[in-house]
Regions:
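Conserved alpha/beta cores of soluble small-molecule-handling proteins
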Residues: 1-95
């Protein structure tokens, strides 16, 4: 089997939970619908965030950029800042 170019096995990631629309899902079961606009059209925004000691470094700046990017492409994030922050920390705490 061909290994993807940027796929590096890391046993620390084997049991992680992925937050899919508010549901914590085992990594192997997490999926996005083929009808999702991010999949079909490539619509999307993302922020890479560093977690240290259970806290997200520079969270306010990350959220500023994320919401600005969403506005630029008319994307509804689906949560306000407080809701997204809560969901991020729920996911961190679960892992």
């Amino acid at each position: 089997m061909v290994q993807p170019l940027h796929d590096t096995s890391d046993p620390r990631n084997a049991g992680i939970l992925i937050n899919v629309n508010g549901t914590l899902t085992p990594r192997g079961e997490a999926m996005v619908s083929v009808f999702d606009s991010g999949f079909m059209l490539g619509d999307g925004i993302w922020e890479g965030m560093r977690v240290h000691g259970g806290r997200i470094a520079f969270l306010d700046r990350h959220l500023d950029r994320l919401f600005e990017g969403a506005k630029a492409i008319a994307m509804d994030v689906g949560l306000d800042r407080a809701g997204l922050e809560a969901r991020l920390y729920e996911t961190i705490d679960a892992n």
